[in-house]
A protein has these predicted regions:
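A short, structured loop/turn motif at beta-sheet edges
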Residues: 11-14, 62-66, 90-101
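Short beta-strand-to-loop capping motifs
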Residues: 10-12, 50, 110
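Intrinsic-disorder/low-complexity, polar/charged segments enriched in Ser/Thr/Lys/Arg/Asp/Glu/Gln
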Residues: 3-7, 43-45, 55, 69, ...
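Hydrophobic ligand-binding cavity/cleft-lining segments
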Residues: 1-41
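Beta-strand/loop substructures that line and gate deep hydrophobic ligand-binding cavities in soluble
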Residues: 75-128, 133-135
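Glycine-rich portal/gate segments that line the openings of hydrophobic small-molecule binding cavities
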Residues: 28-80, 91, 128, 136-139
């Protein structure tokens, strides 16, 4: 099983960051790669579309409001992986209430791709996503 993790310090309090990204259907609010998110199954599943119209279906598998993190599994996607589970987490930065550290991590099994290829793919997705979050917070 492969894994990757990317962290980024962003210029907003952990509470403000979580209020933006903590909703399972909130990806279009901060992630340009996902312009559409539709909640199904009572909000436990999100049906996403990317700019090319490809469908990604994800299931919420863990949510913790107090600790500011959630995990999800990909059920369907155009990515060469299976067994994908990812977590988005907002951390406090000691001694600072005006910034937060956001960590996006995942583990997955390559499917018709090498471990390095899928690790590079998701490292890039997470990095670009956290860059987009930073840009949203500074706009």
């Amino acid at each position: 099983m492969a894994s990757t993790s990317v962290s980024r310090t962003v210029p907003a309090s952990p509470e403000k960051v979580w209020s933006l990204i903590g909703g399972f259907g909130a990806l279009p609010d901060w992630l340009p790669y996902i312009p559409e998110s539709v909640a199904v199954e009572g909000g436990r599943v999100r049906r996403l579309k990317n700019p090319e119209g490809e469908v990604i279906i994800e299931r919420l598998v863990d949510f913790n409001e107090t600790e500011r993190h959630y995990s999800y599994a990909i059920l369907q996607a155009p990515f060469p992986v299976n067994g994908y589970v990812s977590t988005i987490r907002v951390h406090n930065v000691p001694g600072r209430d005006d910034v937060a550290e956001v960590q996006w991590s995942g583990r997955f099994n390559p499917d018709n791709a090498t471990e390095q290829e899928v690790t590079d793919l998701f490292t890039g997705i997470y990095r670009d996503g956290l860059d987009a979050l930073h840009n949203t917070l500074t706009a």
